[in-house]
Amino acid sequence: MTIILGIDPGSRVTGYGLIKESDRKIAYIDSGCIRTSNDAELSHKLLQIYDGICELMDHYSPTEVAIEQIFMHNNPNSALKLGHARGVAMVAAASHRAKICEYSAREIKQSVVGYGAAEKDQVSHMVVELLQLNRAPQKDAADALAIAICHSHMRNGLSKLIGSRGTKRRRMRL
């Protein structure tokens, strides 16, 4: 069994989603949001994110963490803040010796919905379906669960390829 923590980083709200994977089946564990204080300095917000991720790592002991890659904002200041939030989340996970993988928004949507330009409500719907939830989680938590699901799909896709063929190269016949 593998426990995967998905992280949707943000300087105000960082979503998290935990799933367990066993025999190529996934199940929901927990999800939610780490909300930082609106009036806090950036350094204190980053500390809140770090502490929140460390708490999750201590409580659930995930061995693998998946996080969304940074994308360009129209506002460079927002992109920098997002980069800081992402960085402290990665440091918190790395300090607990977790394997960290990064995925683009397009890869996540493609993996979960089957369409790389899917809308957020489509992603949320598929998270509910795939994890058999009674209702949709909060927006940022749903995104984090989608990131964890993407990681599960990617790691299983690669292990299937490696497992079925090994590392032996085969000659293609024309």
UniProtKB/Swiss-Prot annotation:
Cofactors required: Mg(2+)
Active site: D8, E68, D140
Matching PROSITE patterns: RUVC (PS01321)
Domain of life assignment: Bacteria
Binding residues for Mg(2+) 1: D8, D140
Positions that bind Mg(2+) 2: E68
Record's subcellular location: Cytoplasm
Keyword entries, A-Z: Cytoplasm, DNA damage, DNA recombination, DNA repair, DNA-binding, Endonuclease, Hydrolase, Magnesium, Metal-binding, Nuclease
Principal localisation: cytoplasm
Known catalytic reactions: Endonucleolytic cleavage at a junction such as a reciprocal single-stranded crossover between two homologous DNA duplexes (Holliday junction)
Quaternary structure annotation from Swiss-Prot or TrEMBL: Homodimer which binds Holliday junction (HJ) DNA. The HJ becomes 2-fold symmetrical on binding to RuvC with unstacked arms; it has a different conformation from HJ DNA in complex with RuvA. In the full resolvosome a probable DNA-RuvA(4)-RuvB(12)-RuvC(2) complex forms which resolves the HJ.
PANTHER family xrefs: CROSSOVER JUNCTION ENDODEOXYRIBONUCLEASE RUVC (PTHR30194:SF3)
Family: Belongs to the RuvC family.
Protein role: The RuvA-RuvB-RuvC complex processes Holliday junction (HJ) DNA during genetic recombination and DNA repair. Endonuclease that resolves HJ intermediates. Cleaves cruciform DNA by making single-stranded nicks across the HJ at symmetrical positions within the homologous arms, yielding a 5'-phosphate and a 3'-hydroxyl group; requires a central core of homology in the junction. The consensus cleavage sequence is 5'-(A/T)TT(C/G)-3'. Cleavage occurs on the 3'-side of the TT dinucleotide at the point of strand exchange.
Protein name: Crossover junction endodeoxyribonuclease RuvC
Source organism of the structure: Legionella pneumophila (strain Corby)
